[in-house]
Amino acid sequence: MPPVGEHLLLDLYGVSPALLRDADLLESTLREAADALGATVLHAHLHRFGMFGASAPEALGGGVTGVLLLAESHLSIHTWPEHGFAAIDAFMCGAGATLAARAIFEHALAPSRVDVRVAQRGGLPG
């Protein structure tokens, strides 16, 4: 059986903490990546985390987790502003070109370093 999908994993380092706290920017970037992949967005959910022990206005200064549920699978981002780090997944069923999403995230978040891994999922003999 051929692979059932392609899974892109991006680790972005050296990202501005302000960008990693901006849920609106992160959602629009996820949607732009979905569009670049030719994916159909079924649902979006983003959650802003508060900073432990902080009081307003810093209370929402923590990271963001966002997921786009796609007809083809999913896109997700998890951010750690205190470390300048974002972990991004793009999983597309079928023959994917998930690397098309990489440029979208790099342009929006301007990391100083990017680690990229691509895995073919499934593909068991049979």
Predicted regions and their residues:
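Polybasic/polar functional segments that serve as interface/processing modules
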Residues: 1-126
